[in-house]
């Protein structure tokens, strides 16, 4: 199963180190489900702290989050 949603960054510091770490830790908890984050033409594996930070997503930016795998619904709910 694949779920894709467009989400807006609401953290006033954007997807900075702490927020990226929380998302990476969450993604690592889903062994059989891939979580990816896209901003414009750049894509990050949510398991990679560096990939997430390199997106440079700031407050108000829209990102596309995709979950793929048997726990896609649960993973998307956790991200949202």
What are these regions (language model features)?
Residues 55-80:
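C-terminal structural segments of small proteins and small subunits
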Residues 1, 50-54, 76:
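Detector for methionine-enriched segments
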Residues 8-55:
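Compact, glycine-rich, soluble single-domain proteins
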Residues 2-6, 62-64:
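Intrinsic-disorder/low-complexity, polar/charged segments enriched in Ser/Thr/Lys/Arg/Asp/Glu/Gln
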């Amino acid at each position: 199963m694949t779920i894709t949603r467009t989400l807006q960054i609401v953290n006033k510091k954007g997807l900075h180190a702490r927020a990226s770490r929380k998302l990476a830790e969450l993604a690592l908890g889903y062994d059989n489900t891939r979580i990816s984050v896209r901003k414009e033409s750049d894509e990050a594996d949510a398991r990679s702290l560096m990939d997430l930070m390199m997106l440079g997503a700031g407050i108000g930016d829209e990102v596309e989050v995709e979950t793929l795998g048997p726990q896609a619904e649960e993973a998307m709910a956790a991200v949202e």
